[in-house]
Each structure stands twice: as structure tokens, then as C-alpha cells.
Amino acid sequence: MGVKYSSKINKIRTFALSLIFIGFFVMYGGIFFRTSPIVMTLFMILGLLFIIASTVVYFWIGMLSTKTVQVVCPSCNKVTKMLGRVDVCMYCNEPLTLDPTLEGKEFDEKYNRKTRDKKS
């Protein structure tokens, strides 16, 4: 069975959500050090930094999302956003491309890299 792909926007949003949960767990970890206010404060500040990083990532992907190309998926007929030369539909995971040279080829995220690997 092949690799399960996800749209790039959803991957970045999932990363931002994981930063929030990491921040919460780090802050909860600080509760175990109630007897040492300095260590507890460090854990709380570190957790807050994770949550602030998540906010920055959400803001960045929101700004990036407004500039993306919107296409209609041929499988589910829903409007989805594409980042790069190849991406997958956000709803049905159908491989999508706007590059005519890649039509009909096997989907691979390596097509989005600026430098292509040359086979020797």
C-alpha cells in the first residue's frame, strides 16, 4: 500500500495544532515542580512560547492560504487550494497538478522541490 498524502495546508495546520498541545503539556509539566518556583516558571514560559509559536504558524498559513491557487477537484467537485506544483485535494486526497508536464505521472511530493535530483 502506498504512502498516504495530505494537503500541504492541512499538514501545516496540524503542525500548529500540535504546537498548542505541546505547550499545554509543557505547562502541565510545570505543575509537578510547584515546590520550585523558578523551574515551574521556566516550564510555564516555555509552554507559552510553544503556544505563541503556534499562533505565528496559524497566522502565516492564513496569509499564505489567501495567496494560493484555488482549483476545482475533478473527483469531488469541491474547491480546494493548491500549494506548489503538485498537491492533493483537501477533501478526497485526489492528486492535483497545474503543470502539464506532470499530468498522468505518479504523484510524488518531490516534484515541489526547486532542485531536482538527477539520476546518474
Curated annotation (Swiss-Prot):
Its main location: membrane. The keyword Membrane applies. It comes from the Bacteria. The chain crosses the membrane at residues 12-32, 42-62. GO terms for cellular component: plasma membrane. It is a multi-pass membrane protein. Pfam families: DUF2614 (PF11023). It is found in: Cell membrane. Keywords: Cell membrane, Membrane, Transmembrane, Transmembrane helix. InterPro entries: UPF0295 (IPR020912). HAMAP family: UPF0295. Belongs to the UPF0295 family. This is UPF0295 protein Aflv_0370.
